[in-house]
Design a protein with these regions (language model features):
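Membrane-proximal, proline-rich intrinsically disordered regions
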Residues: 25-78, 396-430
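Conserved, well-structured interaction surfaces
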Residues: 52, 91-170, 197-205, 313-317, ...
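Hydrophobic-face positions in mid-chain alpha helices that act as interaction patches
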Residues: 91, 100, 105, 192, ...
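Short coil/turn linking the two alpha-helices of tandem helical-hairpin repeats
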Residues: 166-176, 206, 224-227, 337
Length: 430
């Protein structure tokens, strides 16, 4: 059964992804396998009784897109390398950091959520459109027609916000609903607006978990926009222990944990060396545990390592956590010159996992430690690619370095606006 699992300070619980009152796991599985809304009759979409289904479908689309996004970013950054011989597949282009708007290296844009490779543009665009379409319909319907309209509005706005956030982090530019090309900053501004709406609606509906999810999301986009004080203000409201996760299942390709699939079933992704034996002051960091599978990638001599974080096809994946919020606060404190506050946050996180304390009053050392903490705490959670951009981290291997599968490494850390937009969008031209 697929579920969303928000966690509070003292409790952990699951809610049904479609937000409907179902009486059996089979009923939920049937609904998760429902036809894509694009193939559902228009009169069904316009029926207020289906509001929960529409919002749940949008959330389901985002759940699938999330692991695709994380995988793509892991290849582009230093978390993953390609394990097997893909015959020129898109995995290679991700790892080599070489993309073009069209052709074979544009599979990031043309593949859907059921594809083998981690696709980005179409899955995230679909999730965003579904959430915004649900929002539009909820605005047209009244509370009498949809008794839980306010809570559904909070959910739709929150996942529209997250879809936009990941689009802004992944893409060099993107278009929405055949509109003009938007820069990442413009996309982040739209995401901030959606999160604000989600926070307000969640407050009115008493949906604490969705409100905290949206606060972490708004803090994330505000950090991306350079609004660190505002980001910290949001993050400070997130309670200790909060986590919002998706569960996955082996029901079909769209419900699988793609990270597990690529590392352990297909052997197409291997944890890169910097993460295989990550340690702080000589002590292994339990937040980043990599397992030597004792195998080599298909058709290669590349050693295969997998993240212990995702041991099965059902392994949950975090969308937002208290730990992420704390690191946002630490970054804002460092930016404001409150060095000890940042250090204190690191040490709270260290204490929770049994690591030695960090100590420094040197801003450069504290910044380096912040980068380390984000690498460890947010390992394979979809944050690394944007951190490369925000912190201007060196690309490893460096551009121009010979690539195992031929050619050399490139320097692209975002995906270009795809050719499909130039061909089909009247508001975009070359």
């Amino acid at each position: 059964m697929l579920a969303l699992k928000p966690s509070g300070r003292l409790a952990r619980w699951s809610i049904l992804v479609l937000g409907l009152a179902l009486t059996s796991c089979d009923a939920l599985d049937d609904l998760i396998s429902v036809e894509a809304p694009s193939r559902v009759a228009a009169e069904d979409l316009d029926n207020p009784a289906n509001a929960g289904l529409l919002v749940g479908s949008a959330i389901n689309d985002f759940r699938c897109a999330l692991t695709h996004f994380i995988g793509a970013g892991a290849y582009i950054g230093t978390e993953w390398g390609v394990g097997g011989d893909t015959g020129g597949g898109s995995y290679v282009w991700y790892d080599a950091r070489v993309f073009t708007p069209g052709g074979w290296t544009a599979m990031y844009a043309t593949g859907d959520c059921s594809g083998d490779a981690p696709n980005v543009y179409e899955p995230l665009s679909t999730a965003r459109w579904m959430a915004d379409d649900a929002l539009r319909r909820l605005d047209e319907w009244g509370d009498a027609q949809v008794p839980d309209r306010t809570e559904l509005t909070a959910k739709a706005a929150a996942f529209s916000g997250y879809s936009l956030t990941l689009l802004g982090e992944a893409m060099c530019g993107a278009a929405l609903d055949q509109g003009p090309e938007l820069s990442p900053a413009e996309i982040f501004a739209l995401a901030e607006n959606r999160f604000t709406r989600a926070i307000e609606a969640a407050g009115s509906a008493g949906a604490t978990d969705i409100g905290n999810l949206a606060r972490v999301g708004r803090a994330r986009v505000r950090l991306n926009l350079g609004q660190k004080a505002e980001a910290a203000a949001d993050a400070a409201q997130v309670p200790e222990g909060f986590a919002y996760e998706f569960d996955y299942s082996g029901a079909d390709a769209s419900t699988e944990n793609k990270l597990y699939v690529l590392m352990q079933r297909e052997l197409m992704a291997t944890v890169e060396e910097p993460y295989r034996n990550m340690a702080f002051q000589g002590q292994p960091d339990p937040r980043v545990e990599a397992v030597d599978l004792g195998l080599q990638g298909p058709g290669t001599d590349i050693d295969m390592w997998a993240a212990a974080k995702y041991p099965t096809i059902e392994s949950p994946v975090a969308v937002a956590t208290w730990e992420e919020a704390q690191l946002i606060m630490a970054e804002a404190a460092l930016d404001a010159g409150q060095l000890q506050s940042a250090v204190d946050i690191f040490n709270v996180l260290h204490d929770r996992v049994g690591l030695p304390a960090f100590s420094s009053n040197d801003p450069a050392e504290i910044k380096d430690q912040l980068i380390y903490e984000r690498r460890a705490e947010l390992f394979l959670e979809g944050q690394h690619m944007q951190d490369i951009e925000r912190f201007n981290l060196p690309l490893v291997p460096a551009p121009g370095t010979p690539f195992y599968h031929g050619g050399v490494y490139g320097d692209q850390i975002c995906f270009p606006l795809p050719e499909v937009e130039y061909l089909n969008n009247p508001n975009i031209s070359r």
